[in-house]
Structures are given as structure tokens and as C-alpha cells.
């Protein structure tokens, strides 16, 4: 199903020409309509249009894979503007603010151009650029197509290198296979960074990357690029360019360097050093230029050099850099300001499988190679043991229970001072763990990743949980996974993996790629490609585990509320007091912000619990009036509990709507017989397409109460077959888009 958008407001109030005002009566246990019938849009149309002022849809219109994304607020952009300008003025004392703003734009321009927007980059590159770009930026390649959006649905190409983010110059070490980029903003410098992987050029004895030998993915290294703003163009990092953004300057515009050859930062601390030739070094004492991969484990980790030497790939030849390709770099700044990078060691001609590793950073471009840690492997969690802790184990026990590193005679079971024990997972994962994203929540760290490989329908987002940034992480089982992925009946979205997290305001989103064809995306052996989708996610306390787990509201192919930052409103149902006619113990699930998708989430639904099946009543009340414009009443995850319509939604109004132009008015309005979209159910095979329900949007009204009455199901067949079971109506969640009235 492909749906187009309505590009203008619905102006529903104007449709109110003549109405019958129904009196309010409270003498019945069953709610009745009162006041005027509220003109509304119900989420369905014959021409495929929908209300884009309230909802978004994962239309899969934007081609892309392995997305990385960021949301930029006014505060972010203002900080970046101020710091970029301050650095430029400090480096060039003769430069005036007026001149800098003439060339780069003033604060209002930056806010208009960059703020309140989402930015996304995807796996891609162009081998050539236009003459215009080549002339302006001295560019030879563009890497990672860059998009901009205000609603996570309409993505416009925005990269300044013919639509791409990174300006690859002739002196670059990279030459193609630009995979899996991610954004991060440095709060210290205000700059924007891209972390990703790329294939190197054909190296030689003098380069930090080896000659092209064997399969192309032997030559994958970590890439870091930097820009003053989110659109770019981004340039490959060098020590000189990065440290220039955080250094202090004297009155002559020179970096402040003390007598010990230490570079001083803006806060007076030492940020790095220079060598006797005046070269700026990174915090490891290494020179990083456009021609040196900034994250090069095969060069700077001695144990990797011993275990995976270039001679294993090309017998009889040697090179200073070992064969240890890496992809899917995920940079994360934790709550305490420490930065870590997570990635997958990629399969090579001398190593099998994709395995997850992590490393702490000394600053934005300097890995602390001594902290390199093995975190996860396909089909296994990992536990770390010191040599002393395994001293009592036999050699055969170690070989059986612990991971081996290296090849042939070079095999070892100790890496970086630890032995890594295999803990089999409940769920199979194929030979791949990739697309790693780590997010901190309280005192827990959630390592999320995708198994199997991108061509599998079950490619999804799964989670593992740890107590420290570098683990160990315990992979959770089928009772808590996937976070975002197919269930047993899903026929509408598949392959929903290699994700990223986006924090926008108070909301968390998961952006992922998905199959064009959720059932068979490789007809006749030809892979159809992937496109971009996005859904909400949040944390939910799990009593069995004793801590919060990550849960995704999706994947969806149904209308969903716009992000708060796009609508200017939020889910005010979360602030409502709720009274129900059914099971009060399950009423808490009506406004927890989570609708149910996976089979294990079925208990997280409100249950009517009326044995006589006379319907259920739900009442939301607010102590302070709220101004609302739309709602979704989410259906049950399970067909046999699902409703096919909402019989009544009645609002108690806080004031007469400004658009209401009739004299008769009695403080109420209502919507009757609000049907669920039939595209969200498969009645022949008895399953739901999750994320659907009954929805409506309308011109703004201010309310203090919302009463919902449901008394109609898709089927009563289950009750008829087995009268001993209670198949009462269930409701998964209620989302009411609105804001408090000041």
C-alpha cells in the first residue's frame, strides 16, 4: 500500500454547518453521546491521502540502508554557531564578527537553516562529483548521502557534495565501500562528527593501510569526519583541524603551547601535544592526517598485529598493519561525559563471522587502544575472566568454553588480559552481529544489534544489557526480544534492522531500514533493496529482571502520531487520570506509551474483563484543561481480543471552541462509530497488523475529560469455541496529541 500526503490543513471546523445538540445524561452505565458531533478525519480515504499535520506513515519512500541520524535543536545550533565563530575569531585576530557572519551566516540564519530538524546519512557514495562541487570543495568523491526532515517521513537530500555528506579529497586514505555512517555532536567544540567505515586505497610499505589483497572487505577501516554544522560538508579529520576547535589561542592567533610542548585548551587543561617538528599529535602521540585511518586497530594494537598479520593474507609479504577489518561504528557520549565507540569486527579472508567490540575514547578522535574489549559474538553472550580466575581450568575446558582469537599456531584464548567465556543465547543469530547501538539508561547500558544479516526477514533490533559501558553484556531471550522486528504473523514490515537511536525532545525514536517487500524481498534472486522507517521506543520496567528493558513501538505500517518536535504537542494521555469499567490492574497499560507488538507483550494490555461482554468504558480526566487535536486508541496485539470500532468517544469541553459558530452549546462533543482501518487486520487468517486502531484528528478543542466506550469485536468465534476462556475486549494504549492549557 502506498499512501500520499495531504499537504494542507483539514479545516474540519469549517465543515460544521448544522448539528443536533444532544443533552448530557448520566443515568446509564453505558456512556451516551452528548453535545455536538465533532467533525473529524478517521485515518481512511479512498484516494490514499492522509492527515500529515497529525500523523506520519512509514511509506518506505526514502531509499537507504544502515541509517545514522541526529536531531538538532535550537540550543544545539546556537551553541555550535557561537563556538564556530569564537574559534574563527580567535585564530584570526583581524577577522571581525561582521565579516565572519557575512561569509557563514548570522545566528538567525543558522537557526532557520539547521535547527528543529532531523538529519540522516546512509550507506552510499559517488565515484565522481559535479564540476561545480569539484571547483568549490576540491572534491573527488562524495560519501554518505545526507537527508534532512522535519517529521521523520519527508526526507529531502541536503548534502553539499552533490547530496553527500563527506567531501573526499584526493589526499584521502579512503576510496569506496562507504558503509553505515553515524552522527554525533561534540558538546565541547560544538562540531558535528560522522563515524563510519570505508575501504582504503591500495596501500604500500609507506602507508598505514596495506596493499589491496584478497576480498575488498579485508580493507575496511574506521572513518571520522567533522563539520561546523549538521549539513556539512564534512572533512576527514586530521589532528590539526580537530584540535584547532578546542585549543586556546594567544593574541596573535596562535595555539597556546607551553614549554613542555603541550597544547592548552579553552579551560586551561592540556588537550594534546606537539612533537619537536611542530606536528600536532593526538593523545596517543600519533600523527593523524587525511591519509591515515584514524581508527586503525591493525596498526596500533600489538596483539592484533601478532594474531592477524598481513602475511597470513599474503604469504611471503609483510606490512606494518594487520588484517582486522571493522564496520558499523557507533560513537556514544555517556552521561558522565566519557565517550565510547562500538563496532563490528567484519569477516575477512582470515577470520570468520561478525563480532562486536567496544573501546573507550580519549577524545573525539583518539581511541584508547588499551581498552579494546570483546563484547558479543553470534549466538553467544560473553563473560570476562582474568588469567587468575581460569588458572584452575584444564586446557580442554578452556578450549571448549572460551573464545579463541587468531589463526593456526597463533591461536590464543586470552585477549587484552581477559579470557572470554561463551554463554549460549536462547535465540539463534546466524553468523552475524552487527549494526551495534549502545544507549545508556540510568545505571544500565543497552547494547542493541542486528543478527543474521540484512537479507533475512528476521534481521531486527535485539538487546543485551550490562552494568558498565564495556560490559559484560547479557543478551536477553525471546521474552524480551526483538526490540523492533517481525513477530509470528507480520506480513507488513520485515528486515527492520541496522538502526540508530534519535533523541528528540523527550522522545526516543528508532530509525531503521526495512524491506520493500516484507514477504519476499529477493524475487528471482534479485534483492529489491531497503528503505527507511522510524518508530518510537522507550524503556519499561520488568519485574522479573528487576530493571528496565528497551521496547519499540513497531515496526509499523499504519498512521502514527507525529514526533512531538514536529507537532508542537505531546501525548497528554500520559498525564491523565484513568478510570475503567474493566480490570483496574491492567488500566496502567492504557497510558504507558507502549502499544503491543510481540507475543510476549500481550499481558501489557488493558483487559475489559466483563464476562457478559457488554463492552468497556475508559475515562481519562485532566486536572488542568488540555488542548488536543488527535488521538489513537491502539488495538490489541491479538485478533481474538481486538475491537473493530470504537462505539463512542465523548469529550467534556473546557470552553467553547473558537471555530464553533452555532449558538447551541452544552459543554460536550462526541464522535460515534469510529471504525478501525481494515488494512490493519487479516480476518481470513485471524491476525492483526500491530500499531493500528481507531484514530481521529480534528480542529483543536480544549477538554478536561475524554470517555471511550467500546462494544464491538472482529470476532466472537473464540468464545463460542471455548466458553471457559475470557476473550474480553483489550486495548493496547491510548495516545492523545495535545498540550496543557496555560
Q: Could you tell me what each predicted segment is?
A:
Residues 1-9:
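Positively charged n-region of N-terminal signal peptides that target proteins for export
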Residues 255, 263, 280, 588-600:
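Acidic, glycine-anchored loop motifs typical of Ca2+
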Residues 599-663, 690-742:
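Aromatic, loop-rich ligand-recognition surfaces of beta-strand-rich domains
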Amino acid at each position: 500500500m502506498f499512501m500520499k500526503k495531504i499537504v494542507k490543513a483539514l479545516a474540519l471546523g469549517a465543515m460544521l454547518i448544522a448539528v443536533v445538540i444532544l443533552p448530557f445524561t448520566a443515568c446509564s452505565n453505558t456512556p451516551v453521546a452528548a453535545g455536538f458531533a465533532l467533525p473529524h478525519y478517521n485515518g481512511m480515504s479512498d484516494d490514499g491521502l492522509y492527515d500529515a499535520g497529525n500523523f506520519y506513515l512509514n511509506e518506505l519512500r526514502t531509499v537507504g540502508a544502515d541509517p545514522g541520524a541526529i536531531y538538532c535543536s535550537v540550543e544545539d545550533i546556537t551553541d555550535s554557531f557561537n563556538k564556530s565563530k569564537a574559534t574563527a575569531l580567535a585564530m584570526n585576530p583581524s577577522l571581525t564578527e561582521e565579516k565572519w557572519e557575512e561569509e557563514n551566516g548570522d545566528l538567525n540564519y543558522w537557526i532557520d537553516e539547521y535547527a528543529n530538524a532531523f538529519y540522516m546519512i546512509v550507506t552510499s557514495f559517488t565515484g565522481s562529483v559535479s564540476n561545480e562541487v569539484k571547483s568549490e570543495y576540491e572534491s573527488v568523491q562524495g560519501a554518505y548521502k545526507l537527508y534532512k526532515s522535519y517529521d521523520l517521513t519527508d526526507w529531502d537530500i541536503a548534502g553539499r557534495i552533490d547530496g553527500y555528506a563527506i567531501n573526499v579529497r584526493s589526499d584521502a586514505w579512503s576510496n569506496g565501500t562507504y558503509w553505515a555512517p553515524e552522527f554525533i555532536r561534540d558538546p565541547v567544540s560544538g562540531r558535528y562528527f560522522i563515524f563510519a567505515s570505508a575501504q582504503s586505497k591500495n596501500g604500500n610499505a609507506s602507508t598505514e593501510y596495506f596493499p589491496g589483497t584478497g576480498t575488498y572487505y579485508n580493507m575496511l577501516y574506521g572513518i571520522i569526519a567533522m563539520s561546523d554544522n549538521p549539513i556539512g560538508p564534512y572533512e576527514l579529520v586530521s589532528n590539526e583541524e580537530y584540535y584547532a576547535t578546542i585549543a586556546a589561542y594567544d593574541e596573535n592567533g596562535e595555539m597556546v603551547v607551553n614549554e613542555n610542548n603541550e597544547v592548552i585548551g579553552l579551560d586551561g587543561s592540556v588537550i594534546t601535544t606537539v612533537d619537536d617538528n611542530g606536528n600536532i599529535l593526538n593523545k596517543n602521540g600519533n600523527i593523524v592526517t587525511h591519509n591515515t585511518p584514524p581508527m586503525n586497530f591493525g596498526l596500533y594494537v600489538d596483539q592484533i598485529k601478532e594474531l592477524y598479520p598481513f602475511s597470513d593474507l599474503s604469504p611471503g609479504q609483510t606490512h606494518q598493519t594487520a588484517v582486522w577489518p571493522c564496520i558499523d561504528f557507533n560513537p556514544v557520549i555517556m552521561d558522565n561525559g566519557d565517550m565510547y565507540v562500538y563496532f563490528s569486527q567484519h569477516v575477512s579472508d582470515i577470520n570468520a563471522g561478525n563480532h562486536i567490540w567496544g573501546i573507550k575514547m580519549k577524545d573525539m578522535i583518539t581511541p584508547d587502544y588499551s581498552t579494546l574489549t570483546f563484547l558479543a559474538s553470534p549466538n553467544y553472550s560473553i563473560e570476562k575472566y582474568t588469567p587468575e580466575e581460569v588458572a584452575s581450568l584444564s586446557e580442554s575446558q578452556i578450549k571448549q568454553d572460551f573464545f579463541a582469537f587468531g589463526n593456526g599456531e597463533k591461536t590464543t584464548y586470552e585477549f587484552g588480559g581477559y579470557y572470554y567465556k561463551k554463554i549460549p543465547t536462547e535465540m539463534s543469530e546466524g553468523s552475524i552481529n552487527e549494526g551495534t547501538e549502545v544507549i545508556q539508561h540510568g545505571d544500565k547500558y543497552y547494547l542493541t544489534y542486528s543478527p543474521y544479516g540484512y537479507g533475512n526477514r528476521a534481521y531486527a533490533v535485539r538487546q543485551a544489557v550490562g552494568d558498565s559501558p564495556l560490559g559484560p553484556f547479557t543478551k536477553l531471550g525471546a521474552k524480551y526480544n526483538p526490540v523492533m522486528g517481525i513477530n509470528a504473523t507480520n506480513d507488513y514490515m520485515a528486515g527492520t534492522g541496522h538502526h540508530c537511536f534519535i533523541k528528540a525532545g523527550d522522545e526516543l525514536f528508532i530509525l531503521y531500514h526495512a524491506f520493500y517487500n516484507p514477504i519476499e524481498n529477493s524475487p528471482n534472486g534479485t534483492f529489491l533493496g531497503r528503505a527507511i522507517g522510524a518508530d518510537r521506543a522507550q524503556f519499561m520496567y520488568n519485574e522479573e529482571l528487576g530493571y528496565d528493558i528497551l521496547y519499540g513501538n513497531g515496526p509499523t505500517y499504519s498512521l502514527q502520531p507525529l514526533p512531538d518536535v514536529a507537532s508542537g504537542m505531546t501525548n497528554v494521555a500520559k498525564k491523565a487520570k484513568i478510570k475503567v469499567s474493566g480490570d483496574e490492574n491492567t488500566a496502567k497499560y492504557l497510558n504507558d506509551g507502549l502499544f503491543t507488538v510481540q507475543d510476549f507483550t500481550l499481558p501489557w494490555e488493558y483487559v475489559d474483563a466483563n464476562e457478559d461482554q457488554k463492552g468497556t468504558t475508559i475515562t481519562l480526566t485532566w486536572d488542568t484543561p488540555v488542548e488536543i487535536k488527535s488521538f489513537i486508541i491502539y488495538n490489541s496485539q491479538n485478533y481474538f481480543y481486538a475491537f473493530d470500532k470504537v462505539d463512542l468517544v465523548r469529550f467534556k469541553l473546557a470552553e467553547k471552541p473558537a471555530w464553533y459558530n452555532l449558538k447551541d452549546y452544552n459543554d460536550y462533543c462526541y464522535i460515534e462509530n469510529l471504525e478501525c482501518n481494515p488494512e490493519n487486520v487479516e480476518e481470513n487468517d485471524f491476525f492483526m497488523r500491530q500499531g493500528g486502531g481507531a484514530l481521529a484528528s480534528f480542529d483543536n478543542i480544549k477538554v478536561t475529560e475524554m470517555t471511550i466506550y467500546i462494544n464491538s469485536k472482529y470476532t466472537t468465534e473464540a468464545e463460542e469455541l471455548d466458553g471457559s476462556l475470557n476473550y474480553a475486549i483489550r486495548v493496547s494504549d491510548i495516545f492523545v496529541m495535545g498540550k496543557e492549557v496555560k
